[in-house]
């Protein structure tokens, strides 16, 4: 039985104790059934985030943690034949499903997929117009979150946009959120993510917040759109 992590102070974001290898193996294992488990609840939130990002034809866009590729299909359609979409995921199993979905939709040539860790993005500085993350940032350990956002800031061009959809610790949690955190704390291999402060993390990383919305899935969700500042950002 997995050992429980220490009880956090009120308002403290829980740590992630599952290793990257364990996370990769978990998502490889569930890649072919992930949509059955999560798409019904995550899909509407993800689409709200894509609407806020408002990708335009010709843009270069990265999705971190694209999973089975539903957002990649939407992004590929949005950038058109003159744009480019990149997808980076820790799980090769998820990327294989995403590639199959892209081929089925006829957009595989517009999307470049790579297995990797967002702590070290394999893209040139100031090379991307926009970044999208949906239910991904909360998978990183607490000290890693600012590192991931710093990498996002590095690869975005000045004025570039980032939209993040994530399980939120903002505001009153209620029973469901407390139960979510309890499960993560006591069974980290079963529930590998936990609520985080999405907007606050992005502000701390130096992004200019353009909009922030809080919605209810079965847990609270933040949908935040931000921009890398033109000067000094």
Regions found by a protein language model. Name each.
Residues 159-166:
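Conserved beta-strand signature within the Rossmann-like core of class I S-adenosyl-L-methionine
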Residues 146-158:
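A short glycine-rich, Lys/Arg-flanked "PGG" loop and its adjoining helix->strand segment in the class I
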Residues 62-120:
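Class I SAM-dependent methyltransferase SAM/SAH-binding core
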Residues 1-31:
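N-terminal, positively charged/glycine-rich alpha-helical extensions of SAM-dependent methyltransferases
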Residues 206-233:
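Core SAM-dependent methyltransferase catalytic element
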Residues 119-130:
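A short acidic, Gly/Pro-enriched loop at the edge of an enzyme's catalytic core
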Residues 40-57:
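Conserved alpha-helix/loop element of class I SAM-dependent methyltransferases that forms part
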Residues 190-206:
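Short alpha-helix
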């Amino acid at each position: 039985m997995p050992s429980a992590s220490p009880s956090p102070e009120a308002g403290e974001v829980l740590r992630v104790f599952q290793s990257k290898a364990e996370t990769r193996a978990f998502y490889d294992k569930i890649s072919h059934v992930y949509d059955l488990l999560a798409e019904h609840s995550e899909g509407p939130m993800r689409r709200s985030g894509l609407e806020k990002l408002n990708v335009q034809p010709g843009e270069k866009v990265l999705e971190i943690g694209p999973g089975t590729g539903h957002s990649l299909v939407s992004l590929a359609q949005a950038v058109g034949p003159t744009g480019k979409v990149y997808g980076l995921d820790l799980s090769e199993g998820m990327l294989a499903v995403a590639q199959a979905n892209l081929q089925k939709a006829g957009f595989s040539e517009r999307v470049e997929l790579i297995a990797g860790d967002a702590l070290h993005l394999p893209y040139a500085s100031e090379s991307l117009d926009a970044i999208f993350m949906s239910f991904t940032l909360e998978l990183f350990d607490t000290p890693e979150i600012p590192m991931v956002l710093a990498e996002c800031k590095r690869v975005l061009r000045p004025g570039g946009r980032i939209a993040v959809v994530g399980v939120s610790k903002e505001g009153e949690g209620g029973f469901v959120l407390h139960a979510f955190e309890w499960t993560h704390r006591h069974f980290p291999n079963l529930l590998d993510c936990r609520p985080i402060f999405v907007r606050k993390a992005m502000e701390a990383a130096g992004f200019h917040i353009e909009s922030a919305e809080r919605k209810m899935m079965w847990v609270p969700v933040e949908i935040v759109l931000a921009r890398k500042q033109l000067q000094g950002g």
